[in-house]
Amino acid sequence: MTITPQNLIALLPLLIVGLTVVVVMLSIAWRRNHFLNATLSVIGLNAALVSLWFVGQAGAMDVTPLMRVDGFAMLYTGLVLLASLATCTFAYPWLEGYNDNKDEFYLLVLIAALGGILLANANHLASLFLGIELISLPLFGLVGYAFRQKRSLEASIKYTILSAAASSFLLFGMALVYAQSGDLSFVALGKKLGDGMLNEPLLLAGFGLMIVGLGFKLSLVPFHLWTPDVYQGAPAPVSTFLATASKIAIFGVVMRLFLYAPVGDSEAIRVVLAIIAFASIIFGNLMALSQTNIKRLLGYSSISHLGYLLVALIALQTGEMSMEAVGVYLVGYLFSSLGAFGVVSLMSSPYRGPDADSLFSYRGLFWHRPILAAVMTVMMLSLAGIPMTLGFIGKFYVLAVGVQAHLWWLVGAVVVGSAIGLYYYLRVAVSLYLHAPEQPGRDAPSNWQYSAGGIVVLISALLVLVLGVWPQPLISIVRLAMPLM
């Protein structure tokens, strides 16, 4: 296989992030300088984002049998890069108060971003597995980065052991699919999965095991048990990456797999996915009701959001509107999560010790940091799906797709789940405006809005509001980002 200049242009984001990994690694070996390595990482991620314009000019193509670069890949690559950029930005002040080695943090984020980009472009079960491992392995180190805190170390061990088990399920499932079909390419699987082949026991067992592995990575019920503990134990910037880049990249590749290989045509698989979606929506929201730790609350909330997205995935065979719904919902979820976790990161930095994740830490925040409290309120309203926010547009799309596909009991679950979610999101928002305690335990720096993390949080809030009122530009971008068929 010959690589042409056109192919290299299509792979620019992957190549730039890979080059940044090498440069940061050499920089660490030469001389440890926190500011230099953070700057190099941010420049590399920004350059990869800018390179997407050149990728768009090159057009859609199969670069290798494992990778397909098209509008769909560009959208999800962009979202992964934005989440990685925000993670590095939030991490800088947090690492300023960190006594151990700081520079490796950026290296791990960049390697995980490489995995996310590979997943966004994956067109083969081999690249799907490589991408998932490339995004998971750095996260083992990132989750336990504050290893002197017992909770962070415990979260890292839990995540490592359970993730390894999930990967083995995924790999075994792929082996069974290959044994029955004789191919691992998404497109080839799509051609071979007709004529009742989807009812073959070996194939059903293979896809069932793959659902277990992918369900763990996406923290869907009943494979979700690691989520609240890991979100709570991980440093706030790492929780940001876990909730955004990791979920978006993996859900994107699952969408492509279901689109090319019509796995959803099997009634058995559709029923299993519908039960998982229903359980994730209801259980995720119910468990979040009693949480007083904001990171655990957002962890349970992410379970329910993936349940909502699963409704659109089940309805994928009904038309392009499902693709549109997932794209709009994920963009809304990305910016809302970046804003919410960004506020937690700002409140936690550059303090030593555990993050400011107790709900009590945010009590009365409005009276001394009014803009930060307003940002957090907007994020909570968007995650709850209140009109005039981007979260509402995404949820409306999911409901419309569910109705179009006649998934009535899942539509009912979305409505009930949203009603339950409204309670705990508003509980966080209301606590911001209560009387502040005489001695607040944590507070954001007085100049937070001039820091890089503060600017990211403010831009996220602005986009959530502007695109919530005028979503047409986003809808146009998502419509352009359709996979090459």
Swiss-Prot record:
One GO term describing the cellular component: plasma membrane
EC class name: translocase
EC number per UniProt: 7.1.1.-
Record keyword Membrane present: yes
Pfam families, sorted: Proton_antipo_M
Subcellular location: Cell inner membrane
Record keywords, A-Z: Cell inner membrane, Cell membrane, Membrane, NAD, Quinone, Translocase, Transmembrane, Transmembrane helix, Transport, Ubiquinone
Membrane topology annotation: Multi-pass membrane protein
GO biological process: ATP synthesis coupled electron transport
Known catalytic reactions: a quinone + NADH + 5 H(+)(in) = a quinol + NAD(+) + 4 H(+)(out)
Entry keyword annotation includes Protease: no
Membrane-crossing residue ranges in chain numbering: 8-28, 35-55, 71-91, 105-125, 127-147, 159-179, 203-223, 235-255, 271-291, 297-317, 326-346, 373-393, 408-430, 455-475
GO terms of molecular function: NADH dehydrogenase (ubiquinone) activity; NADH:ubiquinone reductase (non-electrogenic) activity; quinone binding
NCBIfam families: NDH_I_N (TIGR01770), PRK05777.1-1 (NF004439)
UniProt similarity note: Belongs to the complex I subunit 2 family.
Oligomer status and interactors: NDH-1 is composed of 13 different subunits. Subunits NuoA, H, J, K, L, M, N constitute the membrane sector of the complex.
Function: NDH-1 shuttles electrons from NADH, via FMN and iron-sulfur (Fe-S) centers, to quinones in the respiratory chain. The immediate electron acceptor for the enzyme in this species is believed to be ubiquinone. Couples the redox reaction to proton translocation (for every two electrons transferred, four hydrogen ions are translocated across the cytoplasmic membrane), and thus conserves the redox energy in a proton gradient.
Descriptive protein name: NADH-quinone oxidoreductase subunit N
Organism: Escherichia coli O81 (strain ED1a)
Source species taxonomy: Bacteria, Pseudomonadati, Pseudomonadota, Gammaproteobacteria, Enterobacterales
The encoding gene: nuoN
